A protein has these predicted regions:
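Short, often N-terminal, low-complexity regions
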Residues: 11-21, 30
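Transition-metal
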Residues: 26-192, 252-305, 379, 475-488, ...
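Generic C-terminus detector
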Residues: 407, 422-513
Length: 513
């Protein structure tokens, strides 16, 4: 049994050998812990953590109303001044060194990793837990980029696992605000060679070959692993990514050549991680401010990240052995054996390949817009104009909501022991994030402002289990002689088989941006 959570740690006094008293206390403690564990989880808000960066600004505190604290030299908590350059607000993180702390409710003061250790699949869902183990799979931040973000790149899952024993870092940027002249550098404006890129990093001429985007509020950009990227000039961004901080700094706009501003660089280490082709515009989704140029399709994830084995021709199909390519209004979505046509298992339910795979949003009047569907996460933009009733069982995973505009409330139906029914209310303001655990049955999203926009992020359940963490994996190797060793191995039906100890390891901390 895992250790009790912070708020349930009693202090046992020495009882002078009184065994009866000790027994009574232990029995009471057992009953308390059993009742504690049976309490149902609720929506979690976490205390945001500031990350100071030379390219940061003041908007996280001034525009989003963030209040950050840090420890001084004596270990005392002090408020971070609004004049400090803060580049990131870590909203939800299970990263070892950075471990989000629950802000409210009866689990306040406990960390996300402690929740994962204690409640396991009740937090993330059974399929997600079976694959990721006790590692929470996503990292969520708000970014304030006013200076120049370094030119950088992130690895994919395969390389990250092989070299760093970590998850890779796919991410999506949602532009909450963009000042005139703000830029995002994303990929290259033409195909380049590794040698040319290397030389330009040393000569300070990298900008000439970078693809430049002038983003507007409401735009979304999928930052695929291997994509060289940077930004500058006044951007407020909501970022959803894999639970990894593997960042390789390639060029730092000349700061690396000044001893006063130099930071660690990783050009040689990352030279073979980079996609040197021309930037795929399908990774950039223009928002409503572009008018007729606005994108109707989600960001196109590179084909190399698909694991489609059913033969679907649709470019957005992300089905593995089971098709999960966008069934709406319930029903099991799968592929025909003949022709590989995607359809819903229940009659009368419309199936949209590549659409939002969760609940009853109305696509006709653009209440929801799919921003990206990838093996690592799906992100949907919700223009919340009317209350929505959400059934979490249709997701089979946790749900994260980031409020990027306006204000909403998450209302959870409750019932007291005497049968009295009520509603528990959780307010979500612009710049706030909330985690809906998989254990919750249903809830309502209710707008508190006419212009309320939410980002909804889920991790797509994975059917297979990483053999690295699967305790049920066969211990034998082909063509090996195990005579005499069989008795020391567990049978398949042995009740003492250990539970998973954790999946992809805790996020590896890179050098940051």
């Amino acid at each position: 049994m895992t250790a009790p959570l912070q708020n349930s740690k009693p202090t046992l006094q020495r009882l002078g050998g009184n065994r009866a008293a000790v027994f009574i206390i232990l029995l009471t403690l057992h009953d308390f812990l059993m009742e504690f564990m049976e309490k149902k989880l609720y929506p979690f808000k976490f205390i945001p953590v500031a990350s100071k960066r030379p390219w940061g600004g003041h908007d996280l505190m001034k525009k989003l109303g963030k209040e950050f604290v840090e420890c001084d030299e004596e270990g005392n908590e002090v408020a971070i001044s609004a004049d400090e350059l803060v580049g990131e607000s870590w909203e939800i993180a299970d990263m070892g060194v950075e471990d989000s702390v629950v802000k409210e409710g009866w689990l306040a003061g406990n960390t996300l990793s402690e929740l994962m250790e204690t409640y396991l699949e009740k937090v993330v869902g059974e399929d997600v837990y079976n694959y990721y183990g006790r590692q929470f799979p996503l990292l969520v931040k708000f970014l304030d980029i006013h200076g120049k973000l370094s030119v950088q790149v992130h690895p994919d899952d395969e390389i990250a696992a092989e070299r760093y024993d970590s998850l890779g870092k796919a991410e999506i940027w949602y532009i909450m605000d963009a000042e005139p002249g703000a830029k995002v550098y994303m990929g290259f404006n033409r195909e380049v060679s590794a040698q040319e890129f290397y030389d330009r990093c040393h000569k300070g001429t990298v900008e000439e070959i970078l693809n430049v985007i002038y983003p507007k509020k409401g735009d979304a950009i999928y930052v695929a692993p291997g994509t060289v990227h940077a930004a500058e000039g006044g951007l407020l961004i909501a970022e959803i990514q894999e639970s990894s901080d593997l960042t390789f700094r390639l060029y730092d706009w000349g700061r690396e050549f000044d001893p006063a501003t130099a930071r660690q660089m990783h050009l040689e280490e990352a030279i073979d991680l980079i996609n040197y082709g021309r930037f795929d515009e399908g990774l950039y989704r223009k928002g409503p401010l572009w008018g007729d140029e606005a994108s109707d399709e989600p960001c196109k994830v590179p084909e190399s990240f698909y694991s489609c084995s059913c033969g679907c021709d649709d470019e957005h199909c992300t089905c593995g052995d089971d098709c999960t390519c966008g069934c709406h209004e319930g029903g099991e979505c799968h592929c025909h054996e003949e022709g590989h046509e995607c359809h819903c298992g229940e009659e009368g339910h419309e199936c949209h390949s590549g659409g939002h795979t969760g609940h009853h949003h109305h696509h006709g009047d653009r209440i929801t817009e799919t921003l990206v569907e990838s093996p690592q996460f799906n992100v949907t933009k919700i223009n919340l104009t009317d209350p929505l009733h959400i059934y979490t069982e249709q997701f089979a995973t946790f749900i994260i909501y980031m409020c990027v505009e306006g204000e909403a409330s998450i209302q959870v139906p409750t019932e007291s022991p005497d049968g009295h029914k009520g509603m528990e209310n959780h307010v979500l303001k612009a710049g706030e994030t909330i985690l809906i655990p998989a254990q919750m049955d249903d809830f309502y999203l209710v707008p508190r402002d006419r212009q309320t926009v939410l980002l909804e992020a889920v991790t797509r359940p994975v059917d297979d289990v990483d053999a690295y963490i699967d305790p049920m994996t066969e211990a034998y190797l082909d063509d090996e002689d195990y005579e005499g060793l069989e008795d020391g191995l567990l049978d398949d039906d042995d009740e003492d088989v250990a539970e998973p100890s954790g999946a992809s390891p805790l996020g590896f901390f890179g050098a940051g941006r």
